A protein has these predicted regions:
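Short, well-structured beta-strand-loop connectors
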Residues: 48-62, 78-81
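Acidic, low-complexity mobile loops and tails
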Residues: 1-55, 91, 95-131
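Mid-chain, well-packed structural core segment of small domains
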Residues: 62-100
Length: 131
């Protein structure tokens, strides 16, 4: 299984990625490893705009032909945008997990309490060691 782990993102041990948008918001999605493990995704449920999230809280659901899995918010804040395209095209999570397959954008409330996050090299090593 060949993993795609972009250097410009941060990662969690629960296989979410975080992209700092530079405007107080972060974009969040699931990693290439997560989408490969789940298989073909058939349903995605993302939180409503305006929902308050706490770091570590289950906030979205991704469902494949094999399993359903919770997605955990890596940060605390307010949902500022959600990727409504996933409602009609959940397969975007499989084909482009770091681009068109983003799940939500969150206006961060308290960056210091978030994390710890992994750098790309640390996440790649974590995935490799986990088998």
């Amino acid at each position: 299984m060949s993993e795609n782990v972009p250097d410009d993102l941060q990662y969690t041990r629960t296989h979410e990625w975080i992209r700092d948008l530079g405007n107080g918001q972060v974009e969040i999605g699931i990693t290439d490893h997560a989408q490969q493990a789940l298989g073909d995704l058939v349903f995605v449920e993302v939180p409503q705009v305006g929902r308050e999230l706490k770091a570590g809280e289950a906030c979205a659901v991704v469902e494949s032909v094999k399993a359903a899995s919770d997605v955990y918010s890596p940060v605390s804040g307010t949902v500022a945008a959600r990727n409504d395209a996933l409602g009609d095209k959940p397969e975007l999570l499989n084909s482009d997990p770091y681009g068109q397959g983003w799940l939500m954008r969150v206006a961060r409330r308290s960056a210091p309490a978030d994390g710890p996050f992994l750098k790309a090299t640390e996440y790649a090593q974590f995935v490799e060691e986990a088998g």
